[in-house]
Amino acid sequence: MQASRYSIEAEPGWYVSVQQPEEAVAAEEWSPLLSNEPRRQGSSGASFGLSVFNVMNAIMGSGILGLAYVMANTGILGFSFLLLLVALLASYSVHLLLAMCIHTAVTSYEDLGLFAFGLPGKVVVAGTIIIQNIGAMSSYLLIIKTELPAAISEVLPSDHSGAWYLDGQMLLIIICVGIVFPLSLLPKIGFLGYTSSLSFFFMVFFALVVVIKKWAVPCPLTLNCINAVFQISNATDDCKPKLFHFSKESVYAIPTMAFSFLCHTSVLPIYCELRSPSKKRMQNVTNTAIALSFLVYFVSALFGYLTFYDKVESELLQGYSKYLPHDAAVMAVKLCILFAVLLTVPLIHFPARKALMMILFSNYPFSWIRHSLTTLALNIIIVLLAIYVPDIRNVFGVVGASTSTCLIFVFPGLFYLKLSREDFLSWKKLGALSLLSTGTVVGSFSLVLIILDWVNK
């Protein structure tokens, strides 16, 4: 009865190929996620480039503004090591997700939870995605509400206080009705590749401005940069970069770094719509997106740190506002970052809506009415949270730390350990165990830091 051991009934939710190991690996790398030959023959499906832009948009958000502060508290080499480690772990966790999708023949994070732990597993994964993405979207909209009026007022030549376009709530509602809701209504995440490419170029522009402005801010820093441009001195301790630096502030860098490459809720929907989908092709999409995001992260953090050194603000643009208050490039990059954050909202809206639909309407066929009403309901919820819960980022700090840790580290490692038929001492299972352990430690550490921060305040 050797054959029965290799059937799908061998263990609920796990498919094991009857091919030889070498042949199985090769087939797995290039096997399609879905049996969709008619689609392959047509031109439908998102291209490799648009899929890369979508993954990068899912990765990069407002967190890029805090990375220079992280470098100041860890040192250049310490930051580089942590950033590279997190990027590799994120890539490996995506690798495990894709491998499980191939072997279980499912196409969603939620269904992986179903295969691993039954209906409770599916509900837990879907609930985690919904909470994480609603928290992220609300936080992004709160940034828009608080920062966009200030950015607009800096651009205007005279005082326009009291004008409707400087009212954060009014701007937020207009933007959500005119931009966020229409983009969120799109039925396929691949359609957002064009807006994601725009968001990525905004981030690249931000990094370029940070590089250029390194030579516009004097060192040692003075509040009157115009009169001190020629007083630049690298002879003082204030202007010497630290390769390694550890202090009590350094521990706060770990949660920020750990969540720098969170894209896992969007990876599988992007995978499903990829043209000629295969595990190898989607892994290349993910690796390309992570590598480009790593490059933008590192360049902006490095030159942001080398501009302000120990005086770098927790949000990098605040430093430029203080020392270059009327600089045209800085004002432009503020608007670009805000629009980049805005264009991320529809992308992370897609997995949240999908998770909600899978919990409530999994047995129903697609309906435009149901699709539109669910989209509208989610948009109303995140707008209300952004308007009426001013400390939304603090509220979702604890929840976000735990849900992000689960989605990046815990779930991929745990599901692989549960579903895999490999020997426990195999490299993949040991890697999955390491991922699970890392997630548990990072998640617990993040929660402790957030609670201590609340107590100190």
Curated annotation (Swiss-Prot):
GO cellular component terms given for this protein: plasma membrane; synapse
Residue ranges spanning the membrane: these are 48-68, 70-90, 112-132, 171-191, 192-212, 251-271, 289-309, 328-348, 372-392, 395-415, 432-452
Membrane topology (UniProt): Multi-pass membrane protein
> Which InterPro entries does this one have?
AA_transpt_TM (IPR013057)
UniProt modified residues of type N-acetylmethionine: 1
What GO annotations for molecular function exist for this entry?
Answer: active monoatomic ion transmembrane transporter activity; inorganic cation transmembrane transporter activity; L-glutamate transmembrane transporter activity; L-glutamine transmembrane transporter activity; monoatomic cation transmembrane transporter activity; secondary active transmembrane transporter activity
What is this protein identified as?
Answer: Solute carrier family 38 member 6
According to its UniProt entry, this protein's organism is Rattus norvegicus (Rat)
